[in-house]
């Protein structure tokens, strides 16, 4: 994902803090080129995606569980969780459906709003729909946040203080990260993040 640097940092931190006397860890790298176990000497061994196993020196290695450290897609959007559900491997994170809902900001906001939680007014843009963009946000109060609808770590996000050209520039920036962009009114208040598992 576009969040690879953050993912690698997370994975290193997890690996450093797991007790080696209790757990044998394997670094699995998921890239556009494939899925690989990367050994300490940087040798790469392909992952058999039929059962999420690796072959090292002719010996098949299967795993007891997966510690997901991959930010963005496919690590936070339900795709990886769904895969591990299919192969029957337990993993650390919420399930596939919950991941998919929370990764899509528009859907997560709709679910929260339906539950009676106050949410910011927003407009969703799809790639190629930038005609009349000023009109589409005319009912919003500025400042607004412009962000990729699917993604995290604030990549591609901008705060836009007033209407005009800066909004168009922020939309273009966000569209570099996703095919859907959310323009959302700013809510003044304190922000809390609570991890629930």
What residue spans do the PLM features occupy?
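Short, hinge-like loop/turn segments at secondary-structure boundaries
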Residues: 42-46, 110-113, 138-140, 163
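Short, glycine-/small-residue-rich phosphate/pyrophosphate-handling segment
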Residues: 103-123
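Phosphate-binding site of ATP-dependent enzymes
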Residues: 162-197
């Amino acid at each position: 994902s576009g969040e690879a640097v953050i993912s690698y940092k997370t994975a290193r931190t997890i690996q450093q803090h797991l007790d080696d006397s209790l757990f044998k860890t394997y670094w699995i790298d998921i890239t556009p080129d494939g899925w690989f176990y990367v050994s300490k000497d940087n040798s790469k061994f392909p992952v058999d995606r039929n059962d999420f196993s690796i072959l090292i020196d002719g010996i098949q290695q299967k795993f007891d569980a997966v510690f997901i450290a991959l930010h963005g897609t496919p690590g936070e959007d339900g795709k990886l969780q769904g895969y591990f559900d299919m192969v029957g491997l337990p993993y650390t994170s919420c399930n596939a459906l919950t991941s998919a809902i929370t990764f899509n900001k528009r859907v997560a906001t709709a679910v929260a709003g339906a539950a009676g939680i106050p949410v910011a007014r927003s407009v969703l843009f799809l790639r190629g729909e930038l005609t009349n963009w000023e009109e589409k946000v005319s009912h919003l109060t500025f400042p607004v946040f412009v962000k990729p609808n699917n993604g995290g770590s604030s990549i591609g996000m901008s705060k836009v203080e007033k209407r005009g050209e800066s909004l168009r520039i922020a939309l273009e920036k966000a569209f570099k990260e996703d095919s859907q962009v959310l323009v959302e009114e700013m809510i003044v208040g304190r922000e809390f993040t609570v991890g629930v598992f």
